[in-house]
């Protein structure tokens, strides 16, 4: 792959190979950087140096476990909020202060703040959303939970060589029997540790295991077990989209005939350019049931993908909601006491009303 310059950072061929790999298959083995080196033709030390540089350049945000929120007993939802333009930033900051808000963006739509929230099993999601609606001074809020998951699995083609109309070429996490599991205290301990950002060490899982008083083999085995049980979707990197050269982040939303929603959902999910694809509820002021996230290097590339989708599906009633500002993007922290602390400080009796 030719070298690629993003801002002040130049990504050579090995950088691009490494970034493409670790988004989907960071090795859950005792010496992961050595395993990655075998894939890209470098030594363990070279890969560690490369990884550390990409982390310092803030292209790699984090490497950690990605868990299935529902399987852990949490409830989550996308939420759309409309706030007066004069106070969007202040409202977004109030929303971002909630420990369960993992993503929060300003988008070019009447609903101008879009955020995702997850709450523990002993908390009511609607109550937390009502409180945030109140605190933000919102004029309108729509809760848009996942009714069906067709695909989730960000795979940014850092080389930008893949056609936007290409079909999915990697396995992506799709809907299964996603019912909450009863976790043992030992499993909770592993979740708490595996959600932490990976350290740049030859044997990083040994350090994690040591903090738990467990062996490295036991932790690696437990991680694979969590994947097998469907509690963990994968262990992988999350990149800073913009710093990796993906300046266009569009949420494509599609109005489709209700009886054919699944057919169109699976078609949309089949595109490699679509990282997330869901069915969500509609409202009188929101007729779009299908959501497909598209990340690209430019708006032109996004529109190229959408043109291919239109040509294949025949769908024409859609909107592209571009993110114009990122307020927050983290991974959800599970079993964190901050949830209870936030609730005690912010929830009012009126928030619990339907």
Predicted regions: what they are:
Residues 1-354:
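A compositional/biophysical signature of low hydrophobicity enriched in polar/charged and small residues
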């Amino acid at each position: 792959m030719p070298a690629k310059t993003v801002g002040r950072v130049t990504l050579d061929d090995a950088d691009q190979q490494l970034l493409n790999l670790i988004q989907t298959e960071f090795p859950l083995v005792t010496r992961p950087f050595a395993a990655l080196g075998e894939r890209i033709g470098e030594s363990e030390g070279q890969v560690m140096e490369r990884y550390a540089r990409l982390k310092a350049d803030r292209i790699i945000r984090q490497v950690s476990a990605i868990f299935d929120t529902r399987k852990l007993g949490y409830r989550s939802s996308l939420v759309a909020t409309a706030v007066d333009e004069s106070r969007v930033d202040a409202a977004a900051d109030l929303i971002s202060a909630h420990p369960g808000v993992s993503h929060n963006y300003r988008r070019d739509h009447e609903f101008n703040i879009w955020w995702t929230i997850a709450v523990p099993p002993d908390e009511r999601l609607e109550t937390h959303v009502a409180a945030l609606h109140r605190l933000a001074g919102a004029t309108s809020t729509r809760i848009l939970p996942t009714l069906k998951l067709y695909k989730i699995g960000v795979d940014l083609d850092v080389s930008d060589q893949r056609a936007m109309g290409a079909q999915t070429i990697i396995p992506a996490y799709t809907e299964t029997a996603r019912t909450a599991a009863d976790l043992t205290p030992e499993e909770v301990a592993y979740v708490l540790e595996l959600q932490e950002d990976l350290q740049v060490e030859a044997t990083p899982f040994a350090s994690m295991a040591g903090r738990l008083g467990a062996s490295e083999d036991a932790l690696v085995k437990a991680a694979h077990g969590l994947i097998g049980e469907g509690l963990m979707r994968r262990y992988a990197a999350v990149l800073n989209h913009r710093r990796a050269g993906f300046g266009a982040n569009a949420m494509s939303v599609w109005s489709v005939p209700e009886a054919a929603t699944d057919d169109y959902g699976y078609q949309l999910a089949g595109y490699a350019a679509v990282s997330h694809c869901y069915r969500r509820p509609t409202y009188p002021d929101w007729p779009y049931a299908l959501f497909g996230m598209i990340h690209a290097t430019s708006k032109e590339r996004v529109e190229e993908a959408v043109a291919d989708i239109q040509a294949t599906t025949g769908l024409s009633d859609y909107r592209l909601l571009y993110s114009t500002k990122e307020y927050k993007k983290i991974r959800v922290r599970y079993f964190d006491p901050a949830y209870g602390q936030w609730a005690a400080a912010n929830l009012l009796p009126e928030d619990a009303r339907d």
